[in-house]
Amino acid sequence: MSENLKDEILEKYIPKTKKTRSGHIVIKTEETPNPEIVANTRTVPGIITARGCAYAGCKGVVMGPIKDMVHITHGPIGCSFYTWGGRRFKSKPENGTGLNFNEYVFSTDMQESDIVFGGVNKLKDAIHEAYEMFHPAAIGVYATCPVGLIGDDILAVAATASKEIGIPVHAFSCEGYKGVSQSAGHHIANNTVMTDIIGKGNKEQKKYSINVLGEYNIGGDAWEMDRVLEKIGYHVNATLTGDATYEKVQNADKADLNLVQCHRSINYIAEMMETKYGIPWIKCNFIGVDGIVETLRDMAKCFDDPELTKRTEEVIAEEIAAIQDDLDYFKEKLQGKTACLYVGGSRSHTYMNMLKSFGVDSLVAGFEFAHRDDYEGREVIPTIKIDADSKNIPEITVTPDEQKYRVVIPEDKVEELKKAGVPLSSYGGMMKEMHDGTILIDDMNHHDMEVVLEKLKPDMFFAGIKEKFVIQKGGVLSKQLHSYDYNGPYAGFRGVVNFGHELVNGIYTPAWKMITPPWKKASSESKVVVGGEA
């Protein structure tokens, strides 16, 4: 069935496109348990892709959630709107009185005259006006495609403005065309955060201090994660970047362990912080009970404190006991259902684990903007070829900080933890947790998706806003996991309950029986088309 499905997906493509897309579709089998997949390459022109741009990844994903910064988009107003609140990264004023600008959108609103004569003066004025009106902790300036094409020097403008107004002004050359997807923007943001922000704070380090990286507080996820972590006794030093303040990001070097939730968007910072400050990192998963429990136990092993380990087990027992009836109900209602997932660069994997605990079988999974290591595991990184698009992103080199580098976990203990299965500086990728016969599709487009829907008839299909309504017109439940359809949180123990109830309610709604999928309707080929009779 899997091979037939791949053939049917590729059948409609012209030969050149068929050859290109073939490598993006692989099947896990007993003979090839970790097949090489083509990822992080350009989308074929003309294909309806779900990907975003480098600007969206930089401003919209990584930097945008920092709530006391003013984020100025230097470009047309449409780019600003695209990254304004649509992802639902929640935030609230720090301690009830702090700054929170996430309800605002800031743009230089470039017009045709700015493209012809340059937008530098407009950007200077915008920075000064934003400072005088809001007095933020810092300002970010984000370049869009037109800015790169006309050559506005945003780095020089930011440097000059910073001296004039007395606060940090960071410029990000994240023009949309800088990479093949939003992943390029993540990398650009990571580089600047690492070189210009982290390590600039002066707070004292606290006991059991941790950072949560790649968590953006969609629907309040970070708050639920904080509740559990603080209940155990951890100090959540900084979350990058959901509900974050600029100061907390500055003090991210004051931690003993980094937890990486979204591997794709922030693994660069995790690696660089380990090199520069000696802070180890583990891949975590706070989506689904099994993932949460495994993560909490891995954390306790890293700290190796009997009291912390004891408290970890107590909290796990308390939290599971509180939701056990719900878990039993979800399994009763969802056992044997099937799902497909096509989300982001990590979420397909994290949610697959939660679905498995409900008894839901994942048939197809893929990522929008992943790299090969997100599919196959970090062990393949040395074999990944650097192409011309990747070279658009400046590589930075970090070295151990002479004053701040420290050995948090001795090397012999690191090896011991790795042998015990703790994912220190490691991520195994999604493929390893998929069963034989499942299909992986990278950069899935609407055609691929419609074939999957028609042939596999899954009970649910998790995707983004661009795909959601196409799926539901096919009579299949779709939840979009980029912004949670106005719901959430889905992380943490309480998040499992929220997600489970929404799935059960969605699956058993009678609305799906009232929808006729497009492929079951009479063909329109013989009807009136543009230009007259067919």
Swiss-Prot record:
The keyword Iron-sulfur applies. The keyword Nuclease does not apply. Gene3D superfamilies: Nitrogenase MoFe cofactor biosynthesis protein NifE, C-terminal, Nitrogenase molybdenum iron protein domain. Its EC number is 1.18.6.1. It catalyses: N2 + 8 reduced [2Fe-2S]-[ferredoxin] + 16 ATP + 16 H2O = H2 + 8 oxidized [2Fe-2S]-[ferredoxin] + 2 NH4(+) + 16 ADP + 16 phosphate + 6 H(+). Tetramer of two alpha and two beta chains. Forms complex with the iron protein (nitrogenase component 2). This is Nitrogenase molybdenum-iron protein alpha chain.
